[in-house]
Amino acid sequence: MSPAVLNITMAFTFSLLGTLMFRSHLMSTLLCLEGMMLSLFMLATITPLNTHSMIMFPIPIAILVFAACEAAVGLALLAKISNTYGSDFVQNLNLLQC
């Protein structure tokens, strides 16, 4: 395993651990999810270059599309929750209420 792939894998792992550990604020969870998507994008960009596979070249573009959609939905949800409840604490939310 090359050092670049190892660093990207470690970045994904640390972002996943951050998502699991810092669940109290919605903003920190969204930042960790963005870190995961960035590391997946970098890994999907490096892999076709190393394997010389032409079929895998559109995959990074699809990952960028999903990352942009995830960021837009996350920021809209953060704005709505912040305006409604006054903070982004996840523990204070009862999402089962209508």
Curated annotation (Swiss-Prot):
Task: State a single Pfam family of this protein.
Answer: Oxidored_q2
Q: Which GO terms describe its cellular component?
A: mitochondrial inner membrane; respiratory chain complex I
What EC numbers are recorded for this enzyme? Answer: 7.1.1.2
Q: Which UniProt keywords apply?
A: Electron transport, Membrane, Mitochondrion, Mitochondrion inner membrane, NAD, Respiratory chain, Translocase, Transmembrane, Transmembrane helix, Transport, Ubiquinone
Instruction: Give a GO molecular function annotation for the protein.
Output: NADH dehydrogenase (ubiquinone) activity
Where is the protein situated, by its record's location annotation?
Mitochondrion inner membrane
Q: Which GO terms describe its biological process?
A: ATP synthesis coupled electron transport
At the top level, the lineage of the source is Eukaryota
Record bears the keyword Translocase: yes
Which InterPro entries does the protein's record reference? NADH_UbQ_OxRdtase_chain4L/K, NUOK/Mnh_C1-like
EC category name: translocase
User: For this UniProt entry, which segments traverse the membrane?
Assistant: 2-22, 26-46, 59-79
Its UniProt entry gives the catalysed reaction(s) as:
a ubiquinone + NADH + 5 H(+)(in) = a ubiquinol + NAD(+) + 4 H(+)(out)
Report whether Ligase shows up as a keyword of the record. Answer: no
Q: How does this protein sit in the membrane?
A: Multi-pass membrane protein
Q: Kindly state the subunit structure of this protein.
A: Core subunit of respiratory chain NADH dehydrogenase (Complex I) which is composed of 45 different subunits.
Please report which protein family the annotation says this sequence is part of. Belongs to the complex I subunit 4L family.
Instruction: State the function annotated in the UniProt record.
Output: Core subunit of the mitochondrial membrane respiratory chain NADH dehydrogenase (Complex I) which catalyzes electron transfer from NADH through the respiratory chain, using ubiquinone as an electron acceptor. Part of the enzyme membrane arm which is embedded in the lipid bilayer and involved in proton translocation.
Q: What is this protein called?
A: NADH-ubiquinone oxidoreductase chain 4L
Report the source organism.
Alexandromys kikuchii
